[in-house]
């Protein structure tokens, strides 16, 4: 159980998980309106998201240097920047302006993502308490509330920039909590060495890549699928990312209980299969009800894919190599978090938006039948590092 002392100790990074959930939840619900405003095809919109993804990955690479320079002010500065920069894409009227503006906004959130996860890891290390699943559940709950609220506001006629202005005001209060950061920089870790360690990092990174790709692609395209493919309105479309966020929060809160009874690899394989079934249902649905059910099942399953992979990698490397191993896995995995939406756009352009969710389900089954067994086989050969 999470205690009040745990929350108090982690309040600074937890406020940043709230910030990211609010920003990306609002963005997901605004995708149909933004896409219509800049008047582009699925493929061009996907290309805009890809441009933003490249900037985000670069920002993740630069985040440790920024953290070393700003120290305890890093999270507050990045949270403030992210809240302000998300106003700009809502003002764009064409793809030439939208792509670079979204790049800057996404870059701020990417750097913040790295730092806040490092801070949560530091709190875990100091207190000896697991907090990562709870932190990601906070993100999911904020994402769900924000997506639903933004959809309702869009139904009432609010333009995207007005919605993001409201989120920015809420974010100002959260920045005050981020200023409570008292963490010290993490010590450098030794590099994980040997073929076993490299194989573990590669396999774990691929699992996280697919999991994040499915998660963020659904966040970015579910509202459009519900509205364009199935004829839903703005509020009905916003329920897609909202349902995903809510079920992911439930999945993450309950995931730890499953790990006490089953191995990480077993939970990982079953969760990936469950999320694949949800993706198939959502993609092939002919009505809103089945699509909602599909997104709910997808959210429950995919919510624990990345945490299980992170946990498995961290448990199977030596103490001195753990930080470096998690950093490398993150760089592989988070690329999936950002390439998912543009890949969905390209696939949608080629074969249709519904079938792009079916293709996503196939990728998730690759975890169940290929990557999870390979991780289990490597686990049997002993610890790496």
Regions found by a protein language model. Give the residues of each.
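Helix-loop junctions at membrane interfaces in 12-TM secondary transporters
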Residues: 90-101, 284-294
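Conserved MFS/SLC helix-loop-helix module at the cytosolic interface between two early adjacent transmembrane helices
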Residues: 58-93
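Helix-to-loop junctions at the C-terminal end of transmembrane segments
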Residues: 57-71, 154, 251-263, 348-349
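Intracellular juxtamembrane helix-capping segments at the cytosolic ends
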Residues: 110-125, 304-317
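Interfacial helix-cap and linker-helix signal at transmembrane-aqueous boundaries
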Residues: 34-35, 66-67, 152-157, 226-227, ...
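Structural signature of the two symmetry-related core transmembrane helices
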Residues: 73-87, 266-281
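Short amphipathic helix-loop junctions that connect adjacent transmembrane helices
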Residues: 29-43, 220-236
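Symmetry-related core transmembrane helices of the 12-TM Major Facilitator Superfamily/SLC fold
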Residues: 161-178, 357-373
């Amino acid at each position: 159980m999470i205690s009040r002392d745990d929350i108090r100790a982690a309040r600074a990074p937890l406020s940043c998980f709230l910030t990211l959930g609010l920003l990306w939840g609002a963005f997901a619900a605004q995708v149909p309106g933004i896409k219509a405003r800049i008047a582009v095809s699925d493929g061009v919109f996907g290309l805009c998201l890809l441009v933003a993804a490249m900037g985000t990955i670069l920002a993740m690479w630069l985040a440790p240097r920024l953290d070393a320079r700003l120290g305890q002010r890093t999270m507050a500065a990045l949270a403030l920047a992210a809240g302000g920069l998300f106003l700009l894409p809502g003002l764009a009227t064409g793809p030439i302006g939208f792509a670079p503006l979204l790049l800057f906004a996404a870059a701020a959130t990417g750097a913040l993502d790295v730092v806040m996860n490092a801070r949560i890891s530091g709190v875990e290390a100091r207190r000896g308490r697991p907090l990562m699943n709870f932190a990601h559940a906070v993100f999911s709950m904020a994402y769900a509330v924000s997506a639903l609220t933004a959809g309702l506001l869009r139904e009432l006629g609010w333009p995207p920039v007005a919605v993001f202005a409201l989120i920015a005001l809420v974010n100002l209060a959260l920045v005050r909590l981020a200023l409570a950061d008292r963490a010290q920089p993490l010590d450098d870790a030794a590099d994980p060495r040997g073929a076993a360690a490299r194989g573990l990092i590669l396999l774990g990174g691929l699992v996280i890549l697919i999991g994040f790709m499915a998660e963020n692609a659904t966040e970015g395209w579910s509202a459009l699928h519900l509205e364009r493919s199935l004829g839903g309105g703005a509020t009905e479309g916003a329920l897609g990312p909202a349902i995903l966020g809510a079920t992911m929060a439930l999945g993450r809160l309950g995931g730890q209980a499953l790990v006490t009874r089953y191995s990480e690899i077993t939970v990982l394989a079953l969760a990936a299969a469950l999320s694949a079934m949800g993706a198939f249902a959502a993609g092939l649905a002919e009505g809103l009800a089945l699509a909602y059910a599909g997104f709910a099942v997808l959210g429950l399953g995919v919510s624990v894919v990345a945490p299980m992979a992170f946990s498995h990698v961290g448990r199977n490397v030596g103490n001195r190599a753990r930080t470096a191993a998690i950093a490398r896995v993150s760089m592989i995995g988070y690329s999936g978090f950002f390439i998912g939406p543009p890949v969905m756009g390209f696939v949608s352009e080629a074969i249709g938006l519904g079938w792009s969710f079916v293709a996503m389900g196939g990728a998730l089954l690759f975890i169940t039948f290929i990557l999870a067994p390979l991780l289990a086989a490597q686990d049997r050969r002993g610890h790496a590092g």
